[in-house]
Each structure stands twice: as structure tokens, then as C-alpha cells.
Design a protein with these regions (language model features):
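Post-transcriptional modification and biogenesis factors for structured RNAs
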Residues: 1-167
Length: 167
């Protein structure tokens, strides 16, 4: 099993070149592992904004990420401000059930950072206010939300399709 790394630097050394997925204080290790696998498959880096609701060396992350962990760039940040300081002028696009606009009506850019909140609570108001845009995945009114990793896959797939950057 590969060792889990805190930071896997891109070959260019520049984290602002391409789209990224950011998870704000994720609570479930399996979701983080699944998003890391998603990042590996699509060639998109993953940012983890701490604190997380589990130990970084949690076996559940490894089990979900499998050997894909060696194929994804992962950067951990001590908090939201630390995260923001690393993304330069990239636009933060918050994925939230509270948004009015649909991701299918939104114009993504190739260097957007797709931000996802905590599984149980989303993001605090200050983080939502700091986002450049807030959008949602439309779903039936009888249900609350998708799983975090499922949401990331839907949103990232649409964003990459729109920007012509699918692998």
C-alpha cells in the first residue's frame, strides 16, 4: 500500500494552472478517498481544508483511494485562509444546496476551484461569502443532497466538459 502524502506537487510546481477540487473540513474518510480517486482519473488536484473529521492516515481513505493515491496531487491546508492564499486569482465556485443557480446554467473556467462543504453542514457563512460564485446540482425536492463524492463527480464532469478539458 502506498504511503499517504501530505502534498504531491505538480510537475510544473504551480497549483493555479488547472481546475481543482477543494473539500472544506471533510468529515468522512471514504469520501475523501473517493474524491482523490476522481482527481486522479480526471487529472485534477485536490485541496483539503482542515480540520478534517478523521486522522489523515485513516485506512478508509486508503481503501477508497486505492493505488490512485499515487496519481493525484493533494494539498492539505491548515484552514480556509491558508487555502485561499495558495490559489491566486482562481475563482472559487461553491457547490451548495442553498444556491439558486444550477451548475448547468453556469459558465465554468478552466482554472476554477470547485469548493465542497462538510457532509453534514456545508460551509459557514464567512466561507460562502468568500466564494466568487455559488451553484447547485438540481435534484428532486423530496431529497436533500447527493453524497459528497457523487456531487464532486457530477460537478467536475460538467465543468471539465464545458471547458474542453476532459482527459
Amino acid at each position: 500500500m502506498a504511503k499517504m502524502r501530505s502534498l504531491c506537487a505538480p510537475a510544473s510546481g504551480d497549483y493555479r494552472l488547472t481546475m481543482r477540487i477543494a473539500l472544506f473540513q471533510p468529515e468522512i474518510a471514504g469520501n475523501v478517498g473517493a474524491v482523490m480517486r476522481l482527481g486522479a482519473c480526471f487529472g485534477v488536484a485536490v485541496d483539503l481544508v482542515e480540520p478534517m473529521g478523521f486522522a489523515w492516515d485513516d485506512k478508509r481513505v486508503r481503501r477508497s483511494a486505492m493505488d490512485y493515491i499515487d496519481h493525484v496531487e493533494v494539498q492539505r491546508h491548515a484552514g480556509f485562509d491558508a487555502f485561499r492564499s495558495t490559489i491566486g486569482d482562481a475563482r472559487i465556485v461553491l457547490m451548495t444546496t442553498k444556491a439558486a443557480a444550477s451548475l448547468y446554467d453556469f459558465a465554468f473556467r478552466a482554472d476554477d476551484v470547485l469548493l465542497f462543504g462538510m457532509e453534514g453542514a456545508g460551509v459557514p457563512a464567512a466561507v460562502a461569502d468568500a466564494a466568487d460564485a455559488a451553484i447547485k446540482i438540481p435534484l428532486r425536492p423530496q431529497v436533500r443532497s447527493f453524497n459528497l463524492a457523487t456531487s464532486a463527480a457530477i460537478a467536475l464532469g460538467e465543468a471539465l466538459r464545458q471547458t474542453g478539458t476532459l482527459p
